[in-house]
């Protein structure tokens, strides 16, 4: 639903619009195959790997915050499990477990940092 709302909003905007979406691809090596892309996208949002938000400058004209965070608080406990459902991450873990661990932790820290920034931005009063 969020995607369709954002696409309608982008189309209605009287100027250029940009839509960025999480799109799993075959190179991610999704366990279970590419037929699971919708499920994987949903899991990416639930665990905090990907965040849903949109920015509509027209909201500012209405006295509203133009940045809207659509994602709920992620279930961070699922973050690592999400990574390990993709061959690109499990391959790294198999070849270099210590480096993989450090990178997995850094990825989660970065995802948390982004989410917290989005939460702060979404609470700005206009």
Which residue stretches match the model-derived regions?
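Glycine-rich ThDP/TPP pyrophosphate-binding loop and its adjacent helix/strand module
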Residues: 1-73
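Metallocofactor- and cofactor-centric catalytic cores in central/energy metabolism, strongly enriched
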Residues: 6-10, 66-126
